[in-house]
Amino acid sequence: MNIVVQHRIADPEKFFSMDAQEVGAGGPPGVQGRQFFPSTDRSVAVCLWEADSIGTLRDYLDHVTAGASENAYFEVDADRAMGLPQAAAA
C-alpha cells in the first residue's frame, strides 16, 4: 500500500536532525520510505511510504517523530496517482 504522510513540523531542529534515508529504511518489515519533500521554510514536509497498513506506519513514524511533528496519513489511490516510483506503483 502507498501512503502519504504530511508532517506539520513543530520542532524543525529536532525534525531535520534525523536522517530521512535512515528513517525511511529503519522501519519494521514491510515499511519503506520512498520519497521525502520538505518545504523551504521547514514548517511542513510530505513523504511517500510503502507499508502494509496505515496503522503499522503510524506506530513507527509517530514514535520516531514524537515532539518534532504532527503527522497526517492517507492511502494513495495508485490508479489515479501520477509519478509514483516504480517500486511504489507495483
Regions found by a protein language model. Give the residues of each.
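Short S/T/G/P-rich N-terminal loop/turn motif that feeds into the first structured element of a domain
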Residues: 1-69, 73-90
